[in-house]
């Protein structure tokens, strides 16, 4: 383990403006095939499009509207672009007021770098601050540096990289092949503009009035229908059962299909797609989808998956937790190959990484040591979708447990074996593991050095906890009967984290299901039986356990939890006299509640937990932790910056 004390490590870390993104693993477009809505055994994209046609998202009495493309002066734009041409995508978006000035500042910095022929290979945050001083650009909010750096990077990369290895969205914007236009015309017929517009409008309107699942407590929650087999995955519930800053903007307000359409037809995108565009343009690595061999088809399939997840979000917030076979998103997410990770992912990490990669969501920027030749290293800024915590590689004791709190949150390292950012507190020995180079950027005075924090976050911060003891074996417990062993090492999880003067609260957690999670949460069972989610709502912790409808023990535990929650409401949170009430006045309520659960219908209050129960389950069984700012504070902070 190497240790270097440097309070300015974040400011002097390489910002990585020269992107290593390359798409040369795939061809540009399939010259022999146009994707249609006809089902095909040989094309997974056509099958996805056929499901969109069959879906009746929302009915409304609106006429189908045709999008009129912007006319150009000649047809030269439809000709293929030579591979040695340069493509500029600067100024492609009209933005919200709060981001207009940020983008203009980013463009000014990028122009300064280009005009002065600045060497961007060693560009650091300190260099950017120096340029900002020269240009009289004042940014007092530390988190704005994350977004400002993204603006500079996207402008430089896509203005100076040749067409053959640049981003697919740039190729669509530049109309690099006539076949792109032919494919988008066919898509325009498949995505009925009226129905798709209604789906977008409905989910955006729903988002305006949604905070968490307690906002839907006046609805009945339906877990299963007799003709359905699939259910909303707990990871989807953790991400969208509560409104998370930045992710909500990219997934609900942004839309991949309209982004592609606007880039091709108008060469500009509308304000609601701006954050999605910036996320996509600053990707470090492309994704590859099994069975899809070209870039344009990959973008189409990405748009299909985004639409399927949007429908799942709408259903989640309406209390519909089941889905038909054709609507299941999980099989599509499992087919995505993440080229930036060099090891086999577990099922839950695969689903989490795939959901975030659809919109290029990487909310955490960390200064980490990247290995170079020999034993040397280079400090670089690394954007990460989530931070990996591996209890099996950490040496812990009862006096020194793994702690995720405001003090240890600054301890990050880069795992060269997997290409991921890992949580590596120096006091528990993770730095001795092969492939991990650990740098102590703050020395001993962590709390007093927050201004030099090596971590900045855009809205949300996610942790993935590797608890599977045999993770290198292929998963699929639901299909093969294979049972993973789970490491239940307790983790000291703080409900709140203070980072750069901003409070991030624990909003949701996905846990491994080992027992019934009510009577035997302290069970010695170590075999994985599934997953469940705990959301921290305005009314308290709430559990989403879709597998409880299939297990007699879990059904009984759920009924008992619902009855106790009802009694606490009547008795001012007291447990005394519960069984007397159950045999007396509560017998009618118990019978009606049992009938509801037999029909797989529940109310929000039925699955409320105490804070002690929730934190106990999360400590031993969590696999995903999601911290976030309060959404209203996140949005208002951006409007307040306009005043200055």
Curated annotation (Swiss-Prot):
Region of interest (Disordered), ranges: 60-81
Propeptide stretch(es), residue numbers: 1-61
Keywords, ordered alphabetically: Virion
Coiled-coil ranges from the UniProt annotation: none
A GO term from the CC aspect: virion component
Entry's localization field: Virion
Pfam family, one: Pox_P4B
tRNA processing listed as a keyword: no
Cysteine disulfide partners in this protein: none
InterPro entries linked: P4B
Protein modification: The 73-kDa precursor is cleaved to a mature protein of 60 kDa during virion maturation. Proteolytic cleavage of major core proteins OPG129, OPG136, and OPG098, which occurs at a late stage of core formation, is required for production of infectious mature virions (MV).
The family this protein is said to belong to: Belongs to the orthopoxvirus OPG129 family.
Name this protein carries in UniProt: Major core protein OPG129
Lineage of the organism: Viruses, Varidnaviria, Bamfordvirae, Nucleocytoviricota, Pokkesviricetes
Gene that encodes the chain: OPG129
């Amino acid at each position: 383990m190497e240790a270097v004390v440097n309070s300015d490590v974040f400011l002097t870390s390489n910002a990585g403006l020269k992107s290593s993104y390359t798409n040369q693993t795939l061809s540009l477009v399939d010259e022999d095939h146009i994707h249609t809505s006809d089902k095909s055994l040989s094309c997974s994209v056509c099958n996805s499009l056929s499901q969109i046609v069959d879906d009746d998202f929302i009915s409304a009495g609106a006429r189908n509207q045709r999008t009129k493309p912007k006319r150009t002066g000649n047809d030269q734009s439809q000709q293929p672009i030579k591979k040695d041409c340069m493509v500029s995508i600067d100024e492609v978006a009209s933005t919200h007021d709060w981001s207009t000035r940020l983008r203009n500042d980013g463009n000014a910095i990028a122009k300064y770098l280009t005009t002065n022929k600045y060497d961007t290979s060693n560009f650091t945050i300190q260099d950017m601050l120096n340029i900002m001083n020269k240009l009289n650009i004042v940014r007092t909010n530390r988190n704005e540096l994350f977004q400002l750096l993204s603006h500079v990077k996207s402008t430089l990369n896509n203005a100076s990289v040749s067409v053959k290895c640049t981003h697919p969205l740039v190729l669509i914007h530049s109309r690099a092949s006539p076949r792109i236009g032919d494919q988008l015309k066919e898509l325009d017929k498949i995505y009925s503009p009226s129905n798709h517009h209604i789906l977008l409008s409905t989910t955006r309107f729903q988002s305006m009035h949604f905070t968490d699942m307690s906002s839907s407590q006046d609805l009945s929650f339906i877990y299963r229908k007799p003709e359905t087999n699939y259910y909303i995955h707990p990871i989807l519930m953790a991400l969208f059962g509560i409104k998370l800053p930045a992710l909500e903007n990219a997934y609900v307000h942004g839309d991949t299909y309209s982004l592609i359409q606007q880039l091709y037809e108008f060469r500009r995108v509308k304000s609601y797609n701006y954050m999605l565009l910036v996320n996509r343009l600053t990707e470090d690595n492309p994704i590859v989808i099994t069975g899809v061999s070209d870039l344009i088809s990959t973008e189409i399939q990405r748009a299909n998956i985004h639409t399927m997840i949007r429908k799942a979000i709408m259903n989640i917030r309406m209390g519909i937790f089941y889905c038909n076979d054709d609507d299941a998103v999980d099989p599509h997410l499992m087919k995505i190959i993440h080229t930036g990770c060099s090891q086999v992912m577990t099922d839950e990490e695969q689903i989490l990484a795939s959901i975030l990669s659809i919109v290029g969501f990487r909310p955490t920027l960390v200064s980490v040591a990247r290995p170079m030749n020999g034993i040397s290293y280079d400090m670089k800024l690394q954007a990460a979708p989530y931070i990996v915590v591996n209890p099996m590689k950490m040496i812990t004791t009862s006096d020194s447990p793994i702690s995720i709190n405001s003090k240890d949150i600054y301890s990050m390292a880069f795992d060269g074996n997997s290409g991921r950012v890992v949580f590596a507190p120096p006091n528990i020995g993770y730095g001795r593991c092969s492939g991990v180079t650990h740098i102590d950027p703050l020395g001993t005075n962590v709390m007093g050095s927050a201004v030099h924090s090596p971590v900045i976050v855009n809205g949300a911060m996610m942790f993935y906890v590797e608890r599977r003891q045999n993770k290198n074996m292929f998963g699929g417990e639901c299909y093969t009967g294979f049972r993973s062993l789970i490491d239940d090492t307790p983790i000291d999880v703080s409900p709140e984290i203070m980072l750069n003067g901003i409070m991030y609260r624990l909003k949701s957690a996905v846990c491994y299901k080992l027992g019934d999670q009510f009577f035997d949460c302290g069970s010695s069972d170590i075999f994985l039986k599934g997953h469940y989610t705990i959301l921290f709502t305005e009314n308290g912790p709430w559990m989403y356990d879709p597998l409880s409808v299939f297990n007699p023990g879990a059904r009984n535990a759920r009924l008992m939890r619902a009855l106790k929650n009802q009694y606490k409401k009547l008795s001012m949170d007291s447990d005394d006299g519960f069984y007397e009430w159950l045999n007396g006045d509560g017998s009618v309520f118990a019978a009606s509640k049992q009938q509801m659960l037999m029909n797989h219908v529940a109310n929000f209050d039925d699955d409320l937990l105490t804070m002690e129960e929730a934190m106990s389950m999360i400590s031993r069984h969590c696999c995903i932790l999601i911290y976030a700012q309060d959404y209203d504070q996140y949005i208002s902070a951006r409007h307040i910056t306009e005043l200055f």
